Amino acid sequence: MDIKTLTSGALIKHPSRGLLLGTGPFRESAEPPDSGPAFYIDTFRLDDPQPWKIPAALHALPAEGNPPPPAPEIRWTEPSPDAYAQVFAEMMEQIAAGQLMKSVPAIPQFGEMLLPHTPRELILRAVSRSPSHYPYAWWTEREGFCGITPETLFHQQGRRLETMALAGTARPEDEGVFINDDKEIREHEIVAGSILSRLSPCGSVTRTARSVLNLGTLIHFVTYLTLESDEQHTPVHWIRLLHPTPALGSQPRTEKTLAQLDDWRSRLRCPLHFGAPFGFLENGDFFCLVGIRSLYWQGQRLALCTGGGVVASSTLTHEWRELKLKRDTVRRSFRLP
C-alpha cells in the first residue's frame, strides 16, 4: 500500500503488533466504538470534541517496508529567540516567586518543502527508523503530522497500566557529566515524582530506578512505572489523569498553570498537536504515545517543534542550545537536510 497516495490515514507502531495503518473514510466520535479498532487523536488541550478516529479498514504493515524516497529540498527559516526569551523570563519569574517548579516552552521552526516532493513522504521516512522509537501519523488531503517518538504516555491492558517518565537530555558523548548533572536530575525527578503521585491513589505502583536511555543521537533519563489499578477505568480517564506530564506540562499542574502554559505555547506558535496523546484501541488494549519528535504540515509548509524543561537552575543560553540540538535530532531521525 502506497502511503503517499492515501488522501487520509492514521498510523502507529504498537509494541506487540507492529505497524498499524488505518485507512479512510474515517468516522469521528466522542466515544470509542463498542468493538473494532480506533485511533485516539486529540490536541494538547484535549479539546477535540470527537477525538476517536474510526478507520474504514486496518492494515498491518511489514516492519521492513520500501526504502524512503530521495531526500526532499526544504527551505528552513531559523526561529527568532526574542519571543522565546520573553516567555523564558516570565517562567523564571514565576519559578522565583514559588508559583512554578517547572514548565516546558515549545517553539517551532518553519520551512517550505519544494515540489515535486510532498509532506506525506515524511511518513515513509518515519516508519523506517530504529526499533526504540514509535512512528505515528495522522493526515488528511491538505494537512497532517507525523513523528518518531521514544515516549509513551501509557499502555493499558485491563487494570494494568505501564507508563514512563522521560526527562533530562544530553548528547551521548556527555553521558559521564549528564549522570551527575543536578539540573537534569532535578528535571527528571520532578516528572517521575509527579506521575507517581498521580497514580498512587489508584492502586499499587512499582517504580524502577532512574537510568539512562540512549537513543543514538540523544540520551535521556528514564524511569518506568507500573500500576495495578484498584478499579477498571476507560482510556480517557487515564489520559486526563496523566496528560500532560511535567515532561511537557507544568508543575504544579493546576488549571491556572495549564492555562498559562497554553498562552505561552500560543505566543510561540506551537502546533496544537505537539505533545498531545496519540493512541490506538482494540479489544480492550489501549496504547498511547506522547506526540513529540514530530513534523506538521499544511500544504507544502512545515513546522518542526521542540520543547525543553525550564527549572530554577535553567539558563536561557543552555535552553536555546538544547532546543536546537533537539531540532537537529528530529531532522536526523527523518534523514532530512
Question: Which sequence ranges carry the predicted segments?
Answer:
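Terminal domain-start leader segments
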Residues: M1-I12, P69-T118, L122
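A generic N-terminal leader/anchor concept
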Residues: M1-T43, D47
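An anion-binding catalytic pocket shared by soluble metabolic enzymes
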Residues: D2-R17, I107, G111-I190, E282-G307
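Surface-exposed flexible segments
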Residues: R17-P32, P51-H59, I148-R159
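Small-residue-rich
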Residues: P37-N66
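A residue-level signal for conserved active-site and pocket-lining positions in enzyme catalytic cores
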Residues: Y40, G98, F154, G193, ...
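Contiguous alpha-helical scaffold segments within structured protein domains
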Residues: H59-D82, V87-A89, G111-M113, E162-W264, ...
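Conserved hydrophobic core element of enzyme catalytic domains
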Residues: E228-P337
